[in-house]
Amino acid sequence: SYKEGAEAVRWECDGSPEYSLEPTSKESRGTEIVLHINEESAEFLDTVRVESILNKFCRFLPVPIKYEDKQINNPTPAWTKKPSELTTEDYQNFYKELYPYNEPPLFWIHLNVDYPFNLTGILYFPKIKQSYEIQKDKIQLYCNQVFVTDEVKDIVPEFLMLLQGVIDSPDIPLNVSRSYLQGDPNVKKINNHITKKVADKLDEIFTKDRPEFEKKWD
């Protein structure tokens, strides 16, 4: 323990609702976890399967995560930084980190709100082809950099589901019904805020350089 003289503790559970806690001895600081896998869960001993799970759920955790001596996460992703600290290249590199096989995006918006709700994130507007099919799992929802879901249709307006990227908010209710989400005041505010930010960005591009704006839709 970080507290000098504190006693080490051993926690043990066989998978049932009950567990045991007992004093033990330990020289080094920190926690060691030994997980026993039964035959039915043998897939979780496969390196590719483990890396896939870690990449999905631990990709942007705010503390370094190592797997077999290799750090597998980015604890300081672009959306946690101020827009003034990022360059165009930074935004494009983060897009590649999220979608390594996609073409560069048309533009992006950086969300950074702390009142009346907390919301950070980066949303990208992808290149759209005539045969483009909207995929509704391209926006990832996080809560303090912990992955929650990629089902955000009740948080992001339906007509903006072509957007891609990340939103992070501790003010969005977790593990609740769709009807509850639709009635939550913070979700409504976040929904409206995202809509306005996209509209403002489109208006900005149109006003500053109409030929370039029109070229984006060719």
List each model region and its residues:
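Glycine- and acidic
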Residues: 35-36, 141-149, 176-183
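GHKL/Histidine-kinase-like ATPase module
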Residues: 48, 63, 68-167
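A contiguous, basic/glycine-rich beta-loop/short-helix subdomain that forms a polymer-engagement track
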Residues: 215-218
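GHKL-type ATPase core
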Residues: 1-75, 143-146
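Conserved short loop/turn motifs at secondary-structure junctions
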Residues: 39-40, 77-83, 110-111, 178-186
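Conserved, well-folded catalytic cores of nucleic-acid-processing
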Residues: 36, 56-64, 101, 162, ...
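Extended, well-ordered alpha-helical scaffold/bundle regions in very large, multi-domain proteins
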Residues: 174-209
